[in-house]
Amino acid sequence: MPHRASLSIHPRRTLDFSRISFFFSSLRSLRLCDLCVNSFSVFFLFLALAEVSLSGCSSRNPSDPSSLTFLIESSPTNLDPRFATDSQSQRIDGLLFSGLLERDNQMNFHGDLAESWSTPDPLTYVFHLRHGVRFHDGRALTVTDVKATFEFIMNPANKSPKRGALRMVNSIETPDEATVIFHLSQPFASFSLNLIPSAIGIVPANAGADFSRHPIGSGPFRFVQQSQDEEVVVERSPEYFRDAPRIPRVRFRVVPDGVVRALELRKGSADLEMSSLSPDIIPVLARQPDLAVTDRPGTNLTYLGFNLEDPVLSHREVRQALALATDREALIRYLLHGQAKLAAGVLPPDHWAAEPNVAPYPYDPARAEQLLDAAGFPRKQDGVRLQLTLKCSTEEQARLIGAALQEQWRRVGIQLELRPLELATLFSDVAKGNFQITYQRWVGANTDPDFFEYAFSSKRFPPEGANRGHYRNSRIDALTDQIRVEMNQEKRKALCSEVQKILADDLPYLPMWFNDVVSVHRRSLGTLELPSTGNYNFLATLHASGN
């Protein structure tokens, strides 16, 4: 059902003109196009009103006060963990399924389905399963299910996008009812990362082709229903082998429009959102007595991806010029309101393998013009050097960033066309190579050095991986292969350092920033223990009192 909102202004309330003045000065400093200024100023004024009322928006069912309504921007595309690659699917899968291992907020691994595990040598991983674990349908989870899950992904006939992550697995052995042994063809330093619930959750051995329509896992929540582009409903599982979640039911309601998400929270018909609102709206909502804001530094990377098979973007000088023509600090300051940290590379700055001597590209439009001249793209009579197209999502912030890039790049002679697309279409186009530049975000995957191979190796073009820009560099291929098998962390770090220096020069991506994780939620939920990756696993221990 479409969400419609009508606005009424309380006659005794006034607007916060100081914030509005700051907002307009921010836009002027960025010199955004008039259309962007007009549309977003209306948006801001709309939410800056002291009193807002809605008509036609659904509200929480008062007969079910312990349920939680979580607003999300888009539907998960596939809840089968053998195929899920989009962030919404992986985050919800992390609640529905269990993995052999799990990872805490400090990125340390612990047993999940595995009660214990060992690596007697670099090619052998032995897992001993917990006793008494059951799927949500009551059937016992066995070593047969574990083996079948991984072998399904490894079978090329099934075309799982996760097959490449397991290509070093030679065989899987189940010598008894509680033991699973993985035999690798060569050492794989990041193998454990593929064993957490959001990466590869264990499914029943008989899971068929329609499994994504009614997934059955063994995680803290069980699937109830999904209405595409409307909602996903989960409820706590009585079969869960650990302490049951305190929240009986979570309703992930799909509300694509940021205005409506904010108004739903303002009205009280939703309980929380996470990193889905325009940063300018958050202070307005934070002033509401029943709402609170919890935030923390995040690891999710926003980036510009370049298609290196494009005849223009295949020039390294052009990619470097685009980096120099982008005033990222201004974008963070004025459009993100400081809720992000400038990125120099794809690894978070406090990561053990991050290279400190790789610095972010500075804002230097004069140098950008020199590079464009040298690459053979002089200004024409109309002042335009190039015409490029940026594909992004339809969310407000993406379109606003795109409009700012239009203006910044115009100053160096680049005419940028924006093409906002629904997420499913955007992901499909990018995977097919049907793009020049894309504005996207990496969620979670960039917290391990194995990401370099997954995103930049020439062996990892889709569907085998995420090298969507078809970047080719034989040295990167060799280094990322070594990173995957090197078990010594200091040696691995040295390999990662060289990779980061090459990527900073070649620039197949322009790392923009690491977004803070920010949640607007009902104050009665308390301070949320938000993970830096933005996952939803905190819901398993959240208390829903005061609904």
Predicted feature locations:
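Surface-exposed binding/hinge segments that line
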Residues: 118, 126-128, 162-204
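Append "and occasionally in soluble cytosolic enzymes with long acidic Gly/Pro-rich linkers
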Residues: 236, 314-407, 472, 479, ...
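N-terminal lobe/hinge region of extracytoplasmic solute-binding protein
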Residues: 72-121, 151, 214-218
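Ligand/substrate-recognition segments at binding pockets and active sites
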Residues: 60, 228, 375-444, 489, ...
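Long beta-strand-rich cores associated with HINT superfamily self-processing modules
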Residues: 519-547
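Extracytoplasmic/peripheral linker and loop segments enriched in polar/acidic and small residues
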Residues: 126, 415-426, 454-523, 547
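Gly/Pro-rich hinge or "lid" segments in bacterial periplasmic/extracellular proteins
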Residues: 108, 187, 193-245, 249, ...
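Ligand-site clamp/hinge motif
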Residues: 209, 238-283, 406-407, 415-417
